[in-house]
């Protein structure tokens, strides 16, 4: 993979999201400005790390980063805006929540939200840019914990296992029990379960 060349600036924030594909829950984003004086070993795309490693890195990122922030868009916002626009909104919220304003923002993927500072989308950024890797870890650990909490309230759906993604088990339980208030009503399988599909 081509090595990423950083912009000529000091304070760079990385931004990533987790949860665009699930049928339930918020899309969660994170923004992270790392401290060059306190490097963190082993940063990588959160999906390539074990849960144990993600949890350990999450704590290290929170402790060592110059600034970090979480953003989110709730299911009703996803339904109103669509998943792409809701994700952009959640990214804007994460950047706005940083207590140090970044000079430049690097976003995982191929689209940038409108921000008050220069920004660039980086394809496969979660594997190429440590700031984005750190953001991906914070977002995933946060969203996974939310799904585990939701699983306690609604154990019949298996949220702790599939994290809300449309697995065969989730679709079966959706058909059997209907949708919760946390499901995204604009998503096809949920629409069908509610009898709203045309």
Curated annotation (Swiss-Prot):
InterPro entries: RNase_HII, RNase_HII/HIII, RNase_HII/HIII_dom, RNaseH-like_sf, RNaseH_sf. Its main location: cytoplasm. A divalent metal cation binds at residues 16-17, 108. It is found in: Cytoplasm. GO terms for cellular component: cytoplasm; ribonuclease H2 complex. Transmembrane segments: none annotated. Keywords: Cytoplasm, Endonuclease, Hydrolase, Manganese, Metal-binding, Nuclease. Manganese or magnesium. Binds 1 divalent metal ion per monomer in the absence of substrate. May bind a second metal ion after substrate binding. It catalyses: Endonucleolytic cleavage to 5'-phosphomonoester. Residues 10-198 form the RNase H type-2 domain. GO terms for biological process: DNA replication, removal of RNA primer; mismatch repair. Its cofactor is Mn(2+); Mg(2+). It comes from the Bacteria. GO terms for molecular function: manganese ion binding; RNA binding; RNA-DNA hybrid ribonuclease activity. Its EC number is 3.1.26.4. PANTHER family: RIBONUCLEASE H2 SUBUNIT A (PTHR10954), RIBONUCLEASE HII (PTHR10954:SF18). Belongs to the RNase HII family. Endonuclease that specifically degrades the RNA of RNA-DNA hybrids. This is Ribonuclease HII. It comes from Shigella boydii serotype 18 (strain CDC 3083-94 / BS512).
């Amino acid at each position: 993979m081509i090595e990423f060349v950083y912009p000529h600036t000091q304070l760079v924030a990385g931004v990533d999201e987790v949860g665009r594909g699930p049928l339930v829950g918020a899309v969660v984003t994170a923004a992270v400005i790392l401290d060059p004086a306190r490097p963190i070993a082993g940063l990588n795309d959160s999906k390539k790390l074990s849960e144990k490693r993600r949890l350990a890195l999450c704590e290290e990122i929170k402790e060592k980063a110059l600034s970090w922030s979480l953003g989110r868009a709730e299911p009703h916002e996803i339904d109103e805006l669509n998943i792409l626009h809701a994700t952009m909104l959640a990214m804007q919220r994460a950047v706005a929540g940083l207590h140090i304003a970044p000079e430049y923002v690097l976003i995982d993927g191929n689209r940038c939200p409108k921000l008050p500072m220069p920004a660039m989308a980086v394809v496969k950024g979660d594997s190429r840019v440590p700031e984005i890797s750190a953001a991906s870890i914070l977002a995933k650990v946060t969203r996974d914990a939310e799904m585990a909490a939701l699983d306690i309230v609604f154990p019949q759906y298996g949220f702790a296992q599939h994290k809300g993604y449309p697995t065969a088990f989730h679709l079966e339980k959706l058909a059997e029990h209907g949708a919760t208030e946390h499901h995204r009503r604009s998503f096809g399988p949920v629409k069908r379960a509610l009898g709203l599909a045309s």
